[in-house]
């Protein structure tokens, strides 16, 4: 189809293991891509995706949906204009409780793929929702995490991936922080 009749971009909102194949196909066919995180399932796919983006000259966007919320934008503005002073401590959390039991054994689709390393990837809760907390911490403060120490746990017996995570953070500029994400809270 002529460009004026084609869709503008491809949106990828599939389980994690299915992000790269449609992105690859779209980029190879000249479509811009907007994808849920993670961009890829592993480093090999990430390197291939980077090459595809450069070769295609198409735009590629990765969604971090909470940065668009008005209160988040206001918090970022308050930090940027100095209304909160110098940031010394960052506390960010994303607690959930929906995986407090082995919901994945009941046929619930979301729980099924999110707790399966073959479909979700190597990280469970920390990759699923901890990344949103990390993104908010950096986005709002304007600081970058330079070091971390993580304690990831699978509290639910038989679960293959973490369902709870606590992370100590050190940011550029000297600030320190704590990130808590949990799907069993």
Where are these regions (language model features)?
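Predominantly a Rossmann-like dinucleotide-binding segment in NAD(P)-dependent oxidoreductases
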Residues: 67-159
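A structured beta-alpha segment of the ubiquitous adenosine-cofactor-binding alpha/beta core
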Residues: 1-7
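Short glycine-/small-residue-rich Rossmann-like dinucleotide-binding loops
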Residues: 14-15, 181
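NAD(P)-dinucleotide binding in Rossmann-like oxidoreductases
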Residues: 152-162, 172-185
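Structural detector of well-ordered beta-strand residues that form the stable sheet scaffold
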Residues: 34, 59-61, 91, 149, ...
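Beta-strand-loop-alpha-helix segment that lines the small-molecule cofactor/substrate pocket
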Residues: 9, 15-67, 82
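Short, Asp-centered acidic motifs that coordinate Mg2+ and/or phosphate
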Residues: 9, 89, 176
């Amino acid at each position: 189809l002529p460009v004026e009749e084609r869709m503008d971009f491809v949106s990828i909102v599939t389980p994690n293991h299915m992000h790269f194949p449609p992105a690859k196909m779209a980029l190879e066919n000249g479509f811009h891509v907007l994808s849920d995180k993670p961009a890829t399932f592993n480093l090999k796919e990430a390197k291939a995706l980077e090459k595809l983006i450069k070769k295609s000259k198409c735009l590629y966007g990765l969604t971090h949906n909470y940065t668009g919320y008005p209160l988040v934008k206001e918090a970022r503005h308050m930090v940027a204009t100095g209304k909160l002073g110098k940031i010394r401590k960052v506390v960010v959390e994303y607690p959930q409780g929906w995986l407090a039991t082995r919901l994945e054994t009941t046929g619930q689709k979301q729980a099924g793929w999110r707790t399966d390393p073959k479909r979700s990837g190597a990280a469970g809760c920390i990759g699923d929702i901890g990344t949103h907390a990390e993104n908010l911490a950096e986005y709002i403060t304007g600081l970058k995490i330079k070091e971390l120490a993580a304690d990831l746990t699978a509290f639910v017996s038989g679960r293959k991936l973490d369902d709870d995570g606590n992370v100590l953070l050190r940011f550029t500029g000297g600030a320190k922080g704590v990130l808590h994400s949990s799907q069993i809270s």
